[in-house]
């Protein structure tokens, strides 16, 4: 693959207690399970839409070299 895809590092920083069902499901779809959990996802329209729904619960930053800073 010659094209490098942009990726985002997404970290859940707030709890889902009191959050609406759609917000909880959006976090699950992103792969976030708990506070301080970080995932790396491709930067595309679908991911951006999910982030928009939960923007107050997460922090988003560009991923460095496609890694989330954690060994997997």
Curated annotation (Swiss-Prot):
The keyword Hydrolase does not apply. Signal peptide: none annotated. GO terms for biological process: translation. Keywords: Ribonucleoprotein, Ribosomal protein. CDD domains: Ribosomal_L30. One of its GO terms (molecular function) is structural constituent of ribosome. This is Large ribosomal subunit protein uL30. The gene is rpmD. Part of the 50S ribosomal subunit.
